[in-house]
Amino acid sequence: MTTVVNLPRDPNTLSNYNNWVSTHITANFDILFDQRKLAGNVIHRFRSTTDGESNHIILDTNHLDIGSVKVNGQPSEWEYLPRLEPYGTPLKIKLDQGVKLNETIEVDISVQTTEKCTALQWLTPAQTSNKKHPYMFSQCQAIHARSIFPCQDTPDVKCTLDFNITSPLPVIASGLPVRGSSEAPKSDGKTLYKFHQKVPIPSYLFALASGDISEAPIGPRSVVATSPDKLGECQWELEADTEKFINAIEKIVYPYVWGEYNVLILPPSFPYGGMENPIFTFATPSIISKDRENIDVIAHELAHSWSGNLVTNASWEHFWLNEGWTTYLERRLRHGEPYRHFSAIIGWKALTDSVEHFGPEHDFTKLITNLKGMDPDDAFSSIPYEKGFNFLFHLENLVGKSKFDRFIPHYFNKYKGKSLDSYEFKSTILDFFKDDSDASTALNELDWDSWFYAPGLPPKPDFDTSLVDVVYDLAKKWLSLPKSSFKPQPEDIRGLTANQVVVFLEQILVSERQLTPELSKLMGEIYGLAASQNIEVANLYFQVGLQAGDASVVEPTADLLGKIGRMKFVRPLYRKLAKFDRKRALDTFEKHKGFYHPICRAMVEKDLFGKKDE
């Protein structure tokens, strides 16, 4: 039998989820640090969506070791179908007969992960902050859950979850901890940790972490969890704003449904800023900047509790429905309109960078992408975030903010617990405003096809530049050197926020005029940029220096690349370093590639060497 992609809507799954839907998963895993694998079983409850027409279930798997399969307690025949890159090896489970519409069956699969698992990263004690214990964590978005257990690995299917996880070290999962349920350590020193996720979630939100983890409160319904030696500084960074953010977004949408909102600060090799795993946001330590200036990551991941986690894109081709909405909500949380526009200006720079990286005609620069045969990770960029945000911002301006504010809770109520695509979004907003002649006319006259399918940049909004004008002016002064009489002073940036310094450095980076190596070095010395504790600032300064040809930033750049695995910083730094000193870039990558998460490592390899088949 050949392997086929079973549409309806998601081209990135091989499962036949149009015939069967998983409604509950019980995941029983033993975390084996010495073997770097998970071992156990998963029990799926499947509901039939046909009337006896399907006598087999096909699940996504990738590099898994399957032991046995039982259907309703009885051993079942199963086989692997031919592998299909990049989606893995489908698991076909045979049933004696079809099942009536809406009836359920239970499928129990014994499974172990393998060394080729793309979802898990295993850290040695040396890779953690206090160097005492090993650590593991998962990252399942976009299609990596299938490398932990057989599943319908698509955002178009959601189910409830129970986790029963045994480990010698504390465990975090994307469910509510069943408080007081952990048993006393067994003779082998392991403890059973239980979690329950009562809200149906898609497979990409399945999450596990285990290591030397302690917790501290950061709000009435929130804790931060991290390495004990970092707990105090993480608590300080997050305790002032977390509950404020929750209250603010509840006023915009509706009350938080997940019970607790907690944050796990991961070791530095985590490849993203944050991952919106329910109950426990997984976050990069790069947000701990000791100035509370980088917690917009927390605002973003919290907003995912509504957009993405409750209301979900049906496939990764419509990823903007997750990330555009989340970016829009995040920017509604903080500091009023001038700051919202300021944040959007930073986002516009990220959007132009992504369009430049792919090329203005590339399919990945469209709001709706074509991912047939593609790995969704290859399309990952700021485009769904920022093009999505700008589309929603355009709709807000089109109908008026007060009217759009009435649409927001309607939309999130209509699709609560469901997945949707862009066409359903369009029909929903058109229907909501059908009795408002002004809004309805404006929405019906909108060129939806251009927004959905045109590559490249969208129309640029008329942003309020009040918070960026001062840094635009400072950038112009630097770029006027050495011809002008401008004399840089430390006072130039005193009183600016770190995010304003970020915009200043971005202006230098995008200018057609380049700084000389001497001026770039002078900037770092006068403003103390290379020594900044804020990695958003330091990494951009290193990019400025590399672009200017300042050899003095090569060493600190290589040093930083061995300390952080967040792709937002790692990928552009490697690209800039490779242009300036390719050998040093390759040597640095060779030295640190074992430190990076598999997703990050694969993307940097593509940046440095091109695709493997090229």
From Swiss-Prot:
Domain of life: Eukaryota
Active site: E301, Y385
Matches recorded under Gene3D superfamilies: 3.30.2010.30, Neutral Protease Domain 2, Peptidase M1, leukotriene A4 hydrolase/aminopeptidase C-terminal domain, tricorn interacting facor f3 domain
Catalytic activity reported: an epoxide + H2O = an ethanediol
GO molecular function: aminopeptidase activity; epoxide hydrolase activity; metallopeptidase activity; zinc ion binding
Cellular component GO terms held in the UniProt record: cytosol; fungal-type vacuole lumen; multivesicular body; nucleus; NVT complex
CDD domains: M1_LTA4H (cd09599)
Protein's cellular compartments: Cytoplasm; Nucleus
Protein known as: Leucine aminopeptidase 2
Organism: Aspergillus fumigatus (strain ATCC MYA-4609 / CBS 101355 / FGSC A1100 / Af293)
